[in-house]
A protein has these predicted regions:
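Intrinsically disordered, low-complexity terminal tails and inter-domain linkers enriched
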Residues: 1-37
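Conserved, mostly hydrophobic/aromatic
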Residues: 44, 98, 144, 259
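Active-site-adjacent beta->alpha loops and helix N-cap segments on the catalytic face
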Residues: 52-57, 75-87, 155-162, 182-192
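Glycine-rich tight-turn/loop motif centered on a GG-T
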Residues: 53, 57, 66-74, 105-120, ...
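Acidic (Asp/Glu)-rich catalytic clusters
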Residues: 58-62, 83-96, 135-138
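Glycine/small-residue-rich loop that forms an oxyanion/phosphate-binding "nest" at active or ligand-binding sites
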Residues: 103-146
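C-terminal domain-boundary segment and adjacent tail
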Residues: 176, 270-288
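Active-site rim beta-loop-alpha module in soluble metabolic enzymes
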Residues: 183-241
Length: 288
């Protein structure tokens, strides 16, 4: 279990916290089931490239339960990947392959109009590269989470959603769960193909009333207020809902919550979030 080294003081408990096993609790998709509400905290890590680095991976790995490691699409060279894998293994943190469009220049935040077959092939290569390095470190990739523009596109782009499912349907990857947004086309296609799906929500992203994320180019796309983020995470973990940018309460069934590790104060904020969840009696455990 990650240590408490980076966790600040715990916020006050919510008076409306449910008892263990209440209807508001969220059950993860992992292999074992804990008593009471359980949630996974994941972060995107290993997003450096050569001499350039992003975020404090080691500090985040003391807090999160799953690390999504970039594997060459938007970031991540072999040495960066292997260092991140070694750090995750040392802290007993589960690893997913953070696959992306082949877009190093745009950090994977631009849609790439490529054929589904080409996309499938590049995703197989990315997962394979991280898996090979994981094996060299005596560990294994336990899931796949798309990044950036790919994550957003496969919520509605059926061709690219099927390409992701095809990549996970190859013999080498059939046991890997897919991390996806609730209601995304890719989630339904993956379930139809027999691929386990872990549903995810975001601690610091704005939501629309329909449950989709507010695009980054629009106001209210990113939440920066610490108290608002803690309230968001507790509402997700306990009540299974979020408050949209217009104030609407939106049902969001999530087994994992993403904490971005590349924003200012990310480590402090992640520690506050983890402490708040533990103070509410919520078990932190990987969902992959």
């Amino acid at each position: 279990m990650p240590s408490n080294a980076h966790r600040p003081d715990v916020p006050a408990a919510r008076p409306d916290s449910p008892a263990s096993g209440s209807p508001g609790s969220v059950s993860p998709a992992g292999p074992a089931s804990a008593v009471g509400p359980t949630i996974d905290l994941n972060a995107d890590l290993g997003e450096g490239l050569g001499p350039w680095s992003m975020g404090d991976d080691d500090a985040m790995l003391e807090i999160v339960t799953t690390a999504n490691i970039a594997c060459g699409g938007h970031a991540g060279d072999p040495s960066t990947m292997r260092r991140a894998l070694a750090s995750a293994r040392a802290r007993d943190v589960a690893v997913t392959a953070h696959v992306a469009y082949p877009d190093l220049t745009g950090f994977g935040r631009r849609f790439v109009d490529m054929s589904p077959q080409d996309l499938t092939d590049t995703l197989i290569a990315q997962i394979g590269a991280l898996s090979a390095l994981a094996a060299a470190e005596g560990t294994a990739v336990r899931g796949v989470k798309p990044h950036g523009a790919l994550y957003n596109a496969i919520a509605h782009h059926e061709g690219h959603a099927r390409a992701v499912v095809d990549a996970l349907s190859t013999p080498a990857h059939t046991s890997l769960p897919l991390v996806a947004a609730p209601g995304a086309i890719v989630a339904g296609l993956a379930e139809d193909a027999g691929i386990p799906v872990v549903l995810e929500a975001f601690a610091d992203r704005g939501y629309r009333p329909d449950g989709t994320l507010v695009p980054r180019r629009e106001p209210d796309a990113v939440i920066t207020d610490e108290h608002a983020i803690v309230d968001r995470v507790l509402m997700l973990a306990v009540d299974g809902q979020v408050r949209a940018a217009d104030g609407t309460l939106v049902p969001v069934r999530a087994q994992s919550i993403c904490l971005h590790g590349d924003t200012p104060g990310a480590v402090h904020l992640a520690g506050v979030v983890r402490s708040a969840l533990e103070h509410e009696g919520i078990t932190l455990r990987s969902a992959v």
